[in-house]
Amino acid sequence: REFHGSEKKLEKQQELLMRLQENGINTDYFLRNNQESLVSKDKTEQRFTLQHWYEGKECDTKSREDILKSVRTLARLHILMKMEPVEEYREEYLRHNQELRKIRKFIRNKGASNVFEKNYLASVEQFLERAQYAVKLLDETDYDDLRERAWREGQVCHGEYNQHNVLMLKGDHLGTAVTNFGHWSFDIQVADLYRFMRKILEKYNWNLELAGEMLREYHKIRPISAEEWKNLRVRFTYPEKYWKLANYYYSHKKVWISEKNVEKLQNLIRQREIWENFAEECFRDYPQ
């Protein structure tokens, strides 16, 4: 595939992939060329990379077996993914909250002229209230200690761990492969678990039973600390998907809004009460 990034970061990624591969996690590691480089060039000087690939199918979000197998794979992945630093995300939440207010002001000043804008104005106060509550929860947790520990241990996240990047290997009943590590970063590792669970649970209308199964499967392999448990609650409390839709609208010149994004916003509004209840119920009791 074409490559446009930093070769230095790519070497770090390869180091990570090979460590995982050597410890029994199938990855799409890079293949070196005759010059022992990970990046090659064609006649037009276009840079590209070659990666090991697998015969298999993506994680089926309709299959609980695939979902739970993916969670177990993520737990094993996190045990092995250690390198070095993390970024503060409290400031990110505060910035996102300010952006939600800015978009609200922009639409009010110009007048809501389409379905997306009308839905946004009708719902933004409730989602903003939830966003501010998430910041308050974060301030009440041991987030600084959690960040310091993640920094000290060099915890690494996949960055885009979702159903498209977990393959169920053909002919291997137990095997999985994890692909597309291009967004790896230093972070608190339950960020990966949050992202995977959120994408699945949106499809299951925030089903508490399924969420409990996913958390238990992960916890059995890589125990979730009490601080990480609180951090997961904060992440599920913050309306990240709502902010993403609003930010996409605002940063793309507000000229045309796709039907798909209107549907996504309407679905978030419909699910709001179930989603709010989910964060309270799911993380009420720390697993024993």
Predicted segment positions?
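Active-site acidic catalytic loop and adjacent metal/ATP-binding pocket
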Residues: 30, 136-190
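ATP-dependent phospho-/nucleotidyl transfer catalytic cores
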Residues: 7-8, 87-157, 213
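Helix N-cap / loop-to-helix initiation motif
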Residues: 26, 224-228
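Active-site activation/catalytic loop segments of kinase-like enzymes and analogous catalytic loops
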Residues: 190-223, 236-255
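A glycine-centered beta->alpha junction motif in the catalytic cores
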Residues: 48-61, 102-113, 196, 238-257
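ATP/Mg2+ or Mg2+-diphosphate-binding catalytic cores
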Residues: 242-288
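ATP-binding pocket architecture of kinase catalytic cores
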Residues: 1-86
